[in-house]
Amino acid sequence: MNKELPLLQALIDYHKEENTIFSMPGNKCGLAFSRDEIGNYLRENLGNLDITEVDPLDNLHHPEGVIKESKELLAKYYGVKKAYFLVNGSSSGNLSSIFSAFNEGDEVLVERNCHKSVYNGLILRKLKVRYIEPVVYGGGGLFLPPDKNNIYSAIEKCDNPKGIILTYPNYFGISYDIEEIIEDLKKRGLKVIIDEAHGAHYGACKSLPKNIAPLADYTVVSAHKTLPALTGGAYLLVNDDNENLDFYISAFMTTSPSYLIMASLDYSRYYLSKYGKEDYRSLIQIAEKEKKRINELGKVRVLSKEELPEGYDIDLSRYVLVLPKGYSGGKLQDYLRSKKIQCEMSFFSGVVLILSPANVQDGMDKLYQALDDLDMDLLKDEEKSIEFNCIIPEKKMEAYEVFKNNGIWVNLNEAIGRIVKEAIVPYPPGIPLVSSGEKITQEIIEEIRGYLNEGISVLGVRDEEILVVN
């Protein structure tokens, strides 16, 4: 190993392993650019095309030429009034949307398992937060998005809600039919922000869930997660007319935007409009065929829509491999990694794979062979029997108020009755057990110890201590 270039050398070594990439980025380490001649040119000339704001290439912060044209094509494809390129990922889009849609002190509904950047935006904008409970699915650490009842139940508990932030779909590729809900919420005067980070490809063909960007006020889309875009490339799709939005986008984005990322975003929209329907239809046909073969092995099963409650849909271009009780998703991920198959993530009872038209056929053959060869004894984890619960503790302070105070680390035994400063998040499943500003109870301490005793990582816990407001 070249010790003078540790990161670069690690990337080179990983590339030489020739792994099958069933994780982000959506360009699958460049393979997705090989769809046509111009995509190949982009892939092979990344160094040559790394340019800045010279005269013919426009300016992302004040687009008047080719970037303006690209944004107009993007808005037309997704069916929205305005569209923006984001080079700082969806995080900058979430922050810009929150600051544009809401004012300090506004009451806003959010899913408890929303993205970290949404939490950051709520704190920075000094908003009053009302949580929507996630839906526990089975006992394996798999959660569903909130359904209609969860959403309206949360609204009824609000005093004067100004808006709502929903995730569509979640990390598992699962979504709830929220079209009518969005229309109703907008009639009530609520601003609607959709974090569609994992759904950039939605609507490309009829077998995929719908593109709901035309309905929402703001939709944030991570092109780099599923499309042939470079990491950090995302879209913000807008139907709201707030004149301050452009300022917030510039404020939360670098003044030196990467033209490589922007070019890949332009290519991703072009790819969807020209090849999306054909390629995703073919991908899903292959994925459905291979799903039957994998399920017939009797070792893992690919989660299907038929297993989910009414009203839920699942992305057929994403595999959620679920193990029987007593087997470890983390160990399955490690096993597949040893077979040069890169998963997106593991959860308590399985793994998530993000498929792509770029590598689906060869990748599926490799995946099937690895699962066929799998000795299930390698994945046994019978000692772990934790039950995943959804507890929403009493809120004593708004999250933004917490950061006006100093914190102190205290032992779990001494934390009952204290107000949490740093959120406590078991991973998996990645949903905050206690958020900033909430009160610790005996029940919560028992939940934390349950996760720790099972060997599950709990973010916000350090040597059995947590950070509370001093």
Predicted regions and their residues:
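N-terminal "arm"/small-domain region of PLP-dependent enzymes with the aminotransferase-like
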Residues: 1-65, 190
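Conserved PLP-enzyme active-site core in the AAT-like
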Residues: 7-10, 20, 80, 90-303, ...
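Conserved N-terminal alpha-helix of the aminotransferase class I/II PLP-enzyme fold
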Residues: 47-90
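Short glycine-rich or small-residue beta-strand-to-loop segments that form or flank ligand, phosphate
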Residues: 57, 84-86, 164-167, 352-356
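Structural signal for conserved beta-strand scaffold positions within catalytic alpha/beta enzyme cores
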Residues: 85, 131-133, 220-221, 345, ...
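Conserved C-terminal alpha-helix-loop-beta "cap" of PLP-dependent enzymes
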Residues: 295-461
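Terminal helix/beta-alpha structural elements that buttress the NAD(P)+-binding lobe
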Residues: 461-469
